[in-house]
A protein has these predicted regions:
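N-terminal cap/lid segment of alpha/beta-hydrolase-fold proteins
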Residues: 172-226
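Gly/Ala-rich beta-loop-alpha elbow adjacent to hydrolase catalytic centers
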Residues: 236, 316-325
Length: 525
């Protein structure tokens, strides 16, 4: 048990820089336990060979625990100097460092300035930084680790994961209403009909926006519809129009013209530049330009300079693209965001990373843009906004919405985000949410080679641990649900269905719900 506790301590400490000054003071159950840092560093650098009192004590650990501690101490924490510097200089990086500083106190530094400065010095001298490097370099008279606080954070994380698992259990209890075999996926992301490319000059950017236009086949064009609609599709943070060729192709084949936006500064090129250490990671500060991108596309279509026919528009987005759509629809953060964020970010938000973007929005001035008068509906894949529009302060969205998500999503978990949003935005009739078991935040993204064995040459090198199970089947199900939603809102009347629907397609389970169904699931959380 002691070995397990000490391994936990080191696993939590190792990412946080501590200097081998004199002692590391560990606060545990109200008791301060001193650990000689010099002895700990010597033990780590020697590969576990040390005759000090601490070394003798550590020799009593189980071999697996000893190896794990040595690996944590000696493994590189930072392997890309430039990328790490940019991350530490970003809003999200500073916010995370601030939270870590509450748990690992260096002298009287409560905001992590000492840690940040030490990392900067180390990164200016060497390309890689290990825990041992930080232990030796951090200038401090006293370092205190609040193990009670760390255990509290871990308990909070476990609680959040239990809430998500409880949602899965409640979904499993809903009787299956339809069973179908797996769908045959015959269209790959790089084959079949290709989109048209269009460059759109905009006033707020130095270079034209690059758009993908998916025009319906002549025989499928919805020329008889009273309110002919078209679709604007916006990728998420680090996303590319090519990630959604499958959806553009599908929707245009069903009769809707589709325009897929590029968002310079928050697209795959921007995130790639961050990974190479050439810029800060993009965050919520990109939203004003994203909103202006969308406004420019809508104006170009209305003036006829964008060759897309339609009287009504549907805004579709993935992740940050979904948030862009909701803001464009007229929603603005409800008062009290900073207070809600102080509470939400009191623990490291690793089970809901979207909270960092939501909270950064309090420091971002949003442009004054009128909601498009021709707005027909909003579709948000892996959407988020529970801190912006909490259930306790609902805000009215005047058009139908469809939110989709997956049970393996720890960036925008469906229980906290899509279901909360559906209830909080009090949307128009016809609104709903779809949750796919085993799908993740990246399931809607199709990259080159995903249909085969390879991962392709793409920024998103996605394996099953990130993209979830059966991504092509998940995309087929999501496409089917989006088409059904769009067809329903165009219908003159549609009969009300059950609040909760459980479909099984092959091995996948899909759950569709209206706001009442979402509220009933949330009430059980």
């Amino acid at each position: 048990m002691k070995g397990l506790a000490f391994s936990l301590l080191l696993s939590l400490v190792s990412p946080c820089p501590i200097r081998a000054a004199d002692q590391l003071e560990v606060t545990f159950d109200g008791v301060v336990i001193p650990v000689d840092i010099k002895d700990l560093v010597a033990w780590g650098r020697s590969g576990g060979v040390s005759n000090t009192e601490l070394g003798i004590w550590l020799d009593l650990l189980e071999p697996a625990s000893r190896r794990g501690m040595l690996e944590l101490l000696r493994a590189p924490l930072i392997t890309n100097r430039s990328m790490a510097r940019q991350m530490l200089d970003s809003w999200a990086g500073r916010r995370l460092l601030d939270e870590v500083a509450d748990l690992v106190r260096v002298d009287d530094d409560t905001v992590g300035v000492t840690v940040l400065n030490t990392l900067e010095v180390l990164l200016s001298k060497q390309p890689h930084v290990t825990s041992l490097d930080l232990l030796e370099a951090l200038p401090a008279k006293r370092v205190r680790l609040d193990l009670d606080g760390l255990l509290g954070v871990a308990e909070h994380w476990r609680g959040q994961l239990k809430h998500q698992q409880a949602l899965v259990n409640r979904l499993d209890q809903i009787p299956i209403t339809a069973v179908a075999p797996s769908q045959s996926i015959s269209i790959d992301a790089t084959t079949g009909r290709a989109p048209l490319s269009k460059a759109l000059t905009v006033a707020h950017r130095p270079r034209p926006l690059q758009l993908q236009l998916w025009q319906p086949p002549a025989e499928r064009f919805r020329s008889n519809a009273r309110d002919r609609s078209w679709i604007v599709l916006m990728p998420g943070l680090g996303g590319s129009p090519d990630h959604f060729r499958w959806l553009g192709r599908l929707l245009s084949a069903k009769g809707w013209p589709v325009v897929v936006l590029e968002h310079p500064g928050s697209d795959s090129e921007a995130v790639g530049a961050w990974l190479q250490g050439r810029r800060r990671p993009p965050g919520a500060e990109v939203l004003p330009d994203r909103l202006k991108d969308l406004e420019a596309v809508l104006q170009a279509q209305a003036s006829g300079s964008l060759p897309v026919v339609g009287n009504k528009v549907v805004l579709v987005g993935h992740s940050l693209g979904s948030l862009t759509a909701l803001l464009a629809a007229g929603l603005r953060p409800q008062p009290g965001l900073e207070r809600r964020c102080r509470k939400a970010l009191d623990d490291l938000p690793l089970s809901n990373l979207s909270r960092l973007l939501q909270c950064q929005l309090s420091a971002v001035p949003l442009p004054s843009i009128e909601p498009p008068s021709q707005l027909l509906a909003v579709v948000g894949m892996n959407s988020f906004g529970s801190l912006l529009w909490p259930r306790t302060r609902p805000v009215r969205l005047s058009v139908p919405v469809l939110f989709t998500g997956g049970t393996l999503d720890l960036i925008t978990p469906p229980l906290n985000e899509q279901l909360e949003l559906l209830v909080a935005t009090a949307p128009a009739p016809g609104s709903g949410a779809v949750v796919v078991q085993g799908a993740s935040h990246f399931s809607p993204i199709r990259v080159e080679g995903q249909a085969g064995e390879g991962k392709g040459n793409d920024l998103f090198q996605l394996g099953e641990e990130l993209v979830g199970v059966q991504p092509l089947q998940v995309q087929a199900l999501l496409g089917e649900e989006i088409v059904a939603f769009l067809t329903g809102i165009n219908a003159t009347s549609s009969p009300a269905g059950p609040s909760l629907v459980h479909r099984q397609v092959g091995e996948l389970h899909l759950h569709r719900m209206d706001p009442a169904g979402a509220a009933s699931l949330l009430s059980g959380s």
